[in-house]
Amino acid sequence: MRKFLKFILSFTLIAILCGCQRTVIFDIYNNHPKIKIGMSISSEGTFLNNVCASAKKAADEHDVQLEILSANNDQKTQSEQIKKWADDNYAAVIVVLCDDTAGKQILENAGTMPVVFINLCPSDHEVLQSKQNVIYIGGKEGDAGRLQGEFLSEYFISQNNNTPTIAVISGESDNFTSNIRIDAAKEAISNAGLMPFYVYESSGGWDKSKTQSDFYKFLQSKPTIDAVLAVNDDMAIGAADALAQAGYALSSIPIVGVDATPEGRAAVRDGRIDFTVYQNPEYQGAGAVNEIMTMLGGDMPNADVDSIQWHEYMPVTAANIDQLFPDDR
């Protein structure tokens, strides 16, 4: 009986504190709180789909409703999604920004809702410290590119190749995550004292099939390709398939990706790609839902200390993949 009274008093207090915002919505038929969370992602792709799946699983475990929408890389659309969820009395939102400068606008549209940014950190970190119920969970995108660049640099130095010819495959030309990774990779290569020639720079749309088709057409003229730098695993695999289709020897062309998705790990094992970097989708997906439930329970993060939860990228090669992912076998 005491536990029941404690349960009722706890949710009564939440309802009073939330007031007209109706953060907790009660189902009068079973007396069970129904919490609605909105999740807006910049675009769809293998990694973000895995993040969404992790978030959905965590939401189901917490018995809350999660609505997931893609903004199709349109920041205006994403801002409107957040505003609608605020108007519809959603409890909180999870956001993968289209534009890393849009954090302030998202918070303005979110109103009093807790906001968890994931995957792409707002460029202005002060945004994360402007409210107690705002945090970021994810990696530093530049680290992913830096690790790619360092891997390629070490390879070319070992081959005494100071002027490598590199193909670069971006996600989309105007995508911040893609651009940050590429810039960091190029900087790492330059810092190693190499003078690369970027023979091919094109968008693969985060997609394996598009990358394979577009890159294969380029390869018809048989250009020299010393390496491929792709900003995700799907495009790295697409590039590898295009090279093989065009008659290139993959064993002499290092191909690097990002995310270490199950497909990417399989490609590392079978030799199609040589390097990827791992970011755990559960840290971002389930992690965001769990943080929201904690905040809705009244435990707010310290804005100065807990507003950013960095998760480091891990390099993945044929040498360490079985140690990092023993359950794949």
Q: Predicted segment positions?
A:
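Flexible loop/hinge segments that line or gate small-molecule binding clefts
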Residues: 101, 105-143, 165, 261-269, ...
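Hinge/cleft segment of the Venus flytrap/periplasmic-binding protein
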Residues: 22, 168-173, 280-329
